[in-house]
Amino acid sequence: MTKTIGSERKVIVVTGATGGVGRGIALACAEAGWSVWIAARREKEGEAVAAEVDALGGEGHFVACDVGVPGSAAEAIATILSQEGRLDGVVHNATSGLSPVPVSLAEVGLADFQDHVHVALGALHSLARASFEALKESRGSLLLMTSEAGFEGKAKLSPYAGVKGAQRGFARALAREWGRDGVRVNSIAPLASTPAMERAFELDPAMADRVLARNPLRRLGDATEDIGRAARFLLSDDASYVTGHTLMVDGGSCPAV
């Protein structure tokens, strides 16, 4: 019999899951009864999300992880494996704290640019290397949270758009490399109501009208119901034949993929 979401127990880890889309993914996976590890710097916030996972029928855990610190991702993966004995999915959602801040390239110093690269790509490199053997054993998957900015570009968000486009290329290349070992690699380009999006709207008040005007559904996605459940599908066995794909979960805002 073909397995479906809810009939399988998965062990997954989500970076940057103390709020926004990361939290939404954690809660959606909790709905399926999965074991969800919240990998984050802030223990109090991470434990709070883990408690929400428990309340929804999943198994919530916090593991200390600062993706910006070399070795931290590997330590987090090792901790999870020591307690669970397996790992089925890794979600890299963490992003630079500078991501929602619109700024012209002339004002972007090298340190700020490197911060984007370090969190979006350097941490991804570390997570992928640290988790590969476990994902190979479970025939699991790696899921990256990218952005429509990586497809079409965004004025005054060039560092963010640049690393998000690079993430997509990384995912497609890794899908080809890891496919022979049964490991899937996919991406999601979300558009959701999150604290980061709200901050961006505060910095650019006209942005909200622009975003909704180009959205056929005229709304922002819900971090759990829309983005989280799409992520859960890609992490599940129901998506066992899906790899190297970027799923646009943006209400049709960026149709030209």
Indicate where each model-derived feature is located.
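Amphipathic alpha-helical dimer-interface segment in Rossmann-like NAD(P)H-dependent oxidoreductases
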Residues: A78, V119-E137, A175-R176, S236
